[in-house]
Amino acid sequence: MKGQRNIGMVAHDERKEDLLDWVQHNLQALIPHRIFATGTTGGLLRQRFGDLTITPMKSGPLGGDQQLGSMIAEGRLDMLFFLIDPMAPHPHDVDIKALLRLAVLYNIPAAYNRSTADFLITSPFMTGEYIPEIKDYTPYVKRLGAK
C-alpha cells in the first residue's frame, strides 16, 4: 500500500471526544485519506471535519464493527484507529473482539489508544510504501476441507 489509505475509525462513547480532539490535531495528515467510521463516530466526524472524506457505516452495535471487519477481510481497509473505553461494559463485546481479531489476523496497523494512534499517524509508512506481511493460512484452510 502506498499513498492514500482507507482508514477505519471507531470510538466508544466515552472516547468520542478524545478521537475528535486527536483528529483535529492530525487533520492535515488525515485529509489525503479515506475514513470509514461506525455510525455515531462517523456522524460526529462529518459534522466537525468537512475537509475529510468520511463514509459512515452502521452504528457499532447494529453491525458497523462487522462492516469494518468485512472490509479488513476483503483487503479494503488499510488501518484501524479504535479508541476503546476499557472501563465500560459493551453489550456488543463479541463484535468488538471479532473486529480486533481480524485486524490482527490480516496484520493491519491498529491503534487502540491515543499514544499508538500518534505513532501510526507520524510513521513514514503512513504515506510511503508499506507491504504488510500476510500469514499464509492455506494449511489451515486445507485441513478443514474448505476452499
UniProtKB/Swiss-Prot annotation:
GO terms for cellular component: cytosol. It comes from the Bacteria. It is an enzyme of class 4 (lyase). InterPro entries: Methylgl_synth (IPR004363), Methylglyoxal_synth_AS (IPR018148), MGS-like_dom (IPR011607), MGS-like_dom_sf (IPR036914). CDD domains: MGS. Catalyzes the formation of methylglyoxal from dihydroxyacetone phosphate. PANTHER family: METHYLGLYOXAL SYNTHASE. This is Methylglyoxal synthase. The lineage of its organism: Bacteria, Pseudomonadati, Thermodesulfobacteriota, Desulfovibrionia, Desulfovibrionales.
